[in-house]
Amino acid sequence: MHDKILILDFGSQVTQLIARRVREAHVYCEIHPNDVSDDFVREFAPKGVILSGSHASTYEDHQLRAPQAVWDLGVPVLGICYGMQTMAVQLGGKVEWSDHREFGYAEVRAHGRTRLLDGIQDFATPEGHGMLKVWMSHGDKVGEMPPGFALMASTPSCPIAGMADEARGYYAVQFHPEVTHTVQGRKLLERFVLDIAGAKPDWIMRDHIEEAVARIREQVGDEEVILGLSGGVDSSVAAALIHRAIGDQLTCVFVDHGLLRLNEGKMVLDMFEGRLHAKVVHVDASEQFLGHLAGVADPEHKRKIIGREFVEVFQAEAKKLTNAKWLAQGTIYPDVIESGGAKTKKATTIKSHHNVGGLPETLGLKLLEPLRDLFKDEVRELGVALGLPAEMVYRHPFPGPGLGVRILGEVKRDYAELLRRADAIFIEELRGTLATEQDAAAGLCEPSQVGKSWYDLTSQAFAVFLPVKSVGVMGDGRTYDYVAALRAVQTTDFMTAHWAHLPYALLGRASNRIINEVRGINRVVYDVSGKPPATIEWE
């Protein structure tokens, strides 16, 4: 039996990143809502508890509290942001409004020598004080520490940015160690999980496969499962995992909705039928999808339509299976959190995902989502462990709605064809261009990345079709054609992302080829927006 860390979610958009950091330390953890019962906490028997942040205010909301059992267990507890504030209130301290709210980068000074922060710093002041570069996001602050606590960290505008009761193993920080912006955040969380809580680092992907296979078999029994293949990483890994568990009880349905990447259909069929020997049904539903999308410009409406049509196609195929009771999807954690679908239901909705929203209550199939609690990097690791080829596992993510969310506004077949070809050219240039020593010298990549393709050095890259026309000149004639935007980002978790600093020569070749080879596009632009404030996909 694995040691476990219990993460209590108060509704933060980045709670799942806490779980990701804990799992990176090879310790099993689960996220549960903050209002679980005392009996649940005791039966879970965690080695330690982490209290997440929240968009709520501890000062205003007296309902979002940790169960009393958390404080009765006698195990270490780490409070993060709101978690620090509720720890303070529940143990006898005070929280107050902050005159100087902190959102973004901050430098925190460590105080004393606590087990949590001892030896962890980014730099030291001339006076010898250890300093941490962190990410803050709070409007309230702890004004008075509970009895037994000592000051652990501070900033000029937040005098109590960290506190500790070492005797009981209670620690709290006002900043967010789970996000990549906090440089030493991973070390801090590992220190709490491994050293303070004493959890054994024995949870590995091989164990997850065995546990997931057992769960799938127990859930499904002898019933049949239908799964929609999009050609993306998530649905492919989900299919391989379910096929490992139940074999021919799984039927994969590959739906051509007219919004696929270039040669997508052939690649998927060759992979799953030819290499994995899975049952695959190929359905050409492009007329159905494009017909329902005609005249629809709102991105949320488009996503709902695509999700609805997927359900209809799956239901039609399921009726052909005598024992089909389950609809499987490649839903992963970022899909769930961006849809406001965290277990607490408190997170704010950013945009709906067709995997999570759009499924009507009248759906005649039960839902199977074996990847729902995994992050993208964990999904890739799982795919490798399952024996999937690298060209599939490390392919860039592709949204379930396909090119439908990469064509701004109304979706038309002609638009999809232009975008398909432009996207293929961009990806071809990324795959064919290797990072050079000059790129490293210019700061575009690390020296250790020289020789790798720019496709491998970016986390996601694609073209976007803009339904606006611009004037151009080709040969001796005037053109008035559409605009394509290129998007490439680098990220570790897909919750935050930086735009990729690609070499100008690469962008120039991609632009020239698209304009010359894709008749109908005469201008190419590059997206230099990060996430946040922008999302990775344009819609």
Curated annotation (Swiss-Prot):
Q: Where does ATP bind?
A: S230, G231, G232, V233, D234, S235, S236
Catalytic positions are C81 (nucleophile), H176, E178
Pathway the protein contributes to: Purine metabolism; GMP biosynthesis; GMP from XMP (L-Gln route): step 1/1
One Pfam family linked to the record: GATase
GO CC terms in record:
cytosol
Q: What is its EC number?
A: 6.3.5.2
Coiled-coil region(s): none
Write down the superkingdom of origin: Bacteria
* Entries under SUPFAM superfamilies matching the protein: Adenine nucleotide alpha hydrolases-like, Class I glutamine amidotransferase-like, GMP synthetase C-terminal dimerisation domain
Its biological purpose? Catalyzes the synthesis of GMP from XMP.
Q: Per its record, how is this protein called by name?
A: GMP synthase [glutamine-hydrolyzing]
